[in-house]
Amino acid sequence: SVYGDHPGLPKKEGIEGHVLSPYALTKKTDEEFGRLYKTLYGLDTYGMRYFNVFGRRQNPEGMYAAVIPKFLKLLLKDEAPTINGDGRQSRDFTYIDNVIEANLKACLAPSEAAGEAFNIGSGGRVYLIDLYYELCEALGKKIEPVFGPARKGDIRDSNADISKARELLDYDPDYDFEKGIRLAIDWYKENLK
């Protein structure tokens, strides 16, 4: 979200555009507070830029529900999800266990890495329409999606450059999209009945 309207891929720390939503502005402000507290008070802070986190126990309800649990819930009920836009927008979906690993690594990181922001993603890129049909296939469903207008404030594409987190936090995601999505699908099939 802090990358805003900057079109470049992959998204790299230090190359941000104008933010597109109040949420993105609060994320950017939080990172600035972290840098300031490191400079003024010596407090080690680490700005973690999570890219489209998904996994078990994610709430599929509500206005801000993530796309994967929302799609799974509807497909399991034999209902057609709405894809905002044309489905060709892409995201770097990051399995929750990668985020947990990154947070633990940040807790143990050297002070030299403090005050910095880090992309926490898988480093991959998945188109929403491909995600949708992969979920359909995994669930044995043949339901066509409904397409709606693109949401205001949404970016078109997202893909994390995780090289800084690899170097300074020793972050190495264990779960690529395929491995994570299989675990998530299994969990939702078992728990969303």
What would you call each of these model-derived segments?
Residues 1-2, 151:
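Short glycine-enriched loops at secondary-structure junctions
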Residues 55-57, 152:
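Short beta-strand->alpha-helix junction loop in the catalytic core
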Residues 2-47, 59-64:
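Catalytic helix-loop patch of NAD(P)-dependent Rossmann-fold dehydrogenases
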Residues 5, 56, 122:
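Short, conserved catalytic or interaction motifs in soluble domains
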Residues 49-54:
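Conserved SDR Rossmann-fold cofactor-binding beta-strand/turn motif
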Residues 75-193:
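C-terminal substrate-binding subdomain of Rossmann-fold SDR/epimerase-dehydratase oxidoreductases
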